[in-house]
Each structure stands twice: as structure tokens, then as C-alpha cells.
């Protein structure tokens, strides 16, 4: 199982498309699904599941979840809005979420790949 955060963004959607091209379909896409205009980026891709970031945090990032089926985390999810003024949101979204993903990967020996256009 591969997790791709930021799957609706430029890098994430192209990554999912390339993985699909290589025959990989067991992908969980994670993004802020309240931004419906971004869903067009991922519409042509095949995902096993598409999750809102909040649902992902409340599910996969909980201590009581098993993670042995996850082999890779491609972390492309971040707020790239240079006009965003909400410091609390930026810290939660760009720092704390990344930290929790990295801790999950480290604890479970999951390959962690990070890229951002922000």
C-alpha cells in the first residue's frame, strides 16, 4: 500500500498518474477534499481510496492502527498559499502533520519520500 499526501496537487497528481502507468493501483490518496476545484487533477487516476486529511489523521495516524501493509509514504501535502496568514493553520498543516507522518514511517520502517513545490 502506498500513501500519497497532496494527491490533488501538481506533484501528487502526477506522481499518482505515473504510479498508475507503472501498474500500481494500491494507493491511498490524501488531501483537503474541501477544495473541490482541485479534484480535477486526480479524476483520471486510479486510487484504492481517497481520503480527506482529517479522516486520514483520525484513522491511519492513530496509535491503535496497524501499518504493516503500508510500504511507502510520498508526502507532497502542504499549504503552498504564500498569502496564508493563519500561522496556527500553517504550523498544523505544514509542520505537525509532516512530523506525525515521519514518526509513523520511522516507527514502522516505511519508506518516506518528501517533495514540495511550495
Could you tell me what each predicted segment is?
Residues 29-56:
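Glycine-rich phosphate-binding loop and adjoining beta1-alpha1-beta2 segment
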Residues 1, 25-27, 111:
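Residues at the starts of beta-strands that form the adenosine-phosphate
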Residues 2-24:
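N-terminal Rossmann NAD(P)H-binding glycine-rich loop of SDR-like oxidoreductase domains
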Residues 32, 78, 117:
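Active-site loop/turn elements of alpha/beta-hydrolase fold enzymes
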Residues 95-99:
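Conserved active-site region of classical short-chain dehydrogenase/reductase
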Residues 44, 53, 59-93:
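NAD(P)H-binding glycine-rich loop region in Rossmannoid oxidoreductase-like domains
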Amino acid at each position: 500500500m502506498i500513501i500519497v499526501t497532496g494527491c490533488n496537487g501538481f506533484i501528487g497528481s502526477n506522481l499518482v498518474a505515473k504510479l498508475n502507468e507503472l501498474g500500481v493501483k494500491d494507493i491511498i490518496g490524501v488531501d483537503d477534499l474541501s477544495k473541490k476545484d482541485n479534484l480535477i487533477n486526480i479524476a483520471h487516476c486510479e486510487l484504492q481510496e481517497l481520503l480527506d486529511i482529517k479522516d486520514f489523521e483520525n484513522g491511519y495516524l492513530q496509535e491503535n492502527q496497524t501499518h504493516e501493509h503500508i510500504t511507502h509514504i510520498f508526502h507532497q501535502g502542504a499549504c503552498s498559499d504564500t498569502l496564508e496568514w493563519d500561522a496556527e493553520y500553517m504550523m498544523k498543516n505544514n509542520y505537525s502533520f509532516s512530523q506525525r507522518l515521519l514518526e509513523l514511517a520511522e516507527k514502522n520502517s516505511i519508506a518516506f519520500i518528501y517533495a514540495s513545490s511550495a
